């Protein structure tokens, strides 16, 4: 059994995130912990002195409808009971919401949150600054899900030969061995005539975790058409590593992943060391 964080912020209840948690529970029983956060992270509003300590300034609380949050918690608990999911409910009142979520992630196997609704009250353009921060700071893998999407039945492994890409793929296989028989495509980018990076080693590893594995190298001139292709194949779950880090290749760059998140078309699994 795995511990899954299901994240809700402010007055938002993500139907897409709950749908994914329910799907995972149908594959294998999980413990789902509903984390209900403050509607704003006050860290950005608090001043810091030259020693790095928070300055004692007055901060006006962001308006929150406590009754809505309480109602969302009740909906979460009722739905978990109806689905037969073991659950816990955490009402996190820490003013530094993202710091609290990072702490929660330290004690979880995976986090699920809405790539569409996460702190949309701060900025509706995703990935907004809050989502970017938690993608960098999380201490467990994240499943990003849109609000309206098809449940995945295939896997797309983004591989550039670098350690973070391999780490993400291994984390995915450890968490979801039940997807062994799914059609899986491992893709990499051909740059300057380079060969498939560490092909023998990568194929040796991946073939033991994915029964229906194919490897594909995307030429540089076909990169744009590949980006279009992936957005139209909504039955895939994309596995990628190290969002926002310089180690990402051109094919799986920060801007590419941001475009996928912005498009609200795919489930994305992100993991980093």
Describe each model-derived feature in a short phrase.
Residues 1-57, 137, 150-218, 235:
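Small/aliphatic-rich secondary-structure junction motif
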Residues 6, 113-114, 157, 240:
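Redox-cofactor binding/interface segments in oxidoreductases and associated redox assembly factors
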Residues 13, 120, 246-248:
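Short glycine-rich, flexible loops that bind phosphorylated cofactors or substrates
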Residues 39, 74-111, 208-238, 242-258, ...:
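Structural beta-alpha unit
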Residues 55-70:
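A short acidic, glycine-rich active-site loop
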Residues 87-145:
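Hydrophobic alpha-helical segments and helix pairs
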Residues 115-116, 241-243, 272-273:
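Short secondary-structure boundary segments
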Residues 263-273:
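Short, flexible loop segments at boundaries between secondary-structure elements
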């Amino acid at each position: 059994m795995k511990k899954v964080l299901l994240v809700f912020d402010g007055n938002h209840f993500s139907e897409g995130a709950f749908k994914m948690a329910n799907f995972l529970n149908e594959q294998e029983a999980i413990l789902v912990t509903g984390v209900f956060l403050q509607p704003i992270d006050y860290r950005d509003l608090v001043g810091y002195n030259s020693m790095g300590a928070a300055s004692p300034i007055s901060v006006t609380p962001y308006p929150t409808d406590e009754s809505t949050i309480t109602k969302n918690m009740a909906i979460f608990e009722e739905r978990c009971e109806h689905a037969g999911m073991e659950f816990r409910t955490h009402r996190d009142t820490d003013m530094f919401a993202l710091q609290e979520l990072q702490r929660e992630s330290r004690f979880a196997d995976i986090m699920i949150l809405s790539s569409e609704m996460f702190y949309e009250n701060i900025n509706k353009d995703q990935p907004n600054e809050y989502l970017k921060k938690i993608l960098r700071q999380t201490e467990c893998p994240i499943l990003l899900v849109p609000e309206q999407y098809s449940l995945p039945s295939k896997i797309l492994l983004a591989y550039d030969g670098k350690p973070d890409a391999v780490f993400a793929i291994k984390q995915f296989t450890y968490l979801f061995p039940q997807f062994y028989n799914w059609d899986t495509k491992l893709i990499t980018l051909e740059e300057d005539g380079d060969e498939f990076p560490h092909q023998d080693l990568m194929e040796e590893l991946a073939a033991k975790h994915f029964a229906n594995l194919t490897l594909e190298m995307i030429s540089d001139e076909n990169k744009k058409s590949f980006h279009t292709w992936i957005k139209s194949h909504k039955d895939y779950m994309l596995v990628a590593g190290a969002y926002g880090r310089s180690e990402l290749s051109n094919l799986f760059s920060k801007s590419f992943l941001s475009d996928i998140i912005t498009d609200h078309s795919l489930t994305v699994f992100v993991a980093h060391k």
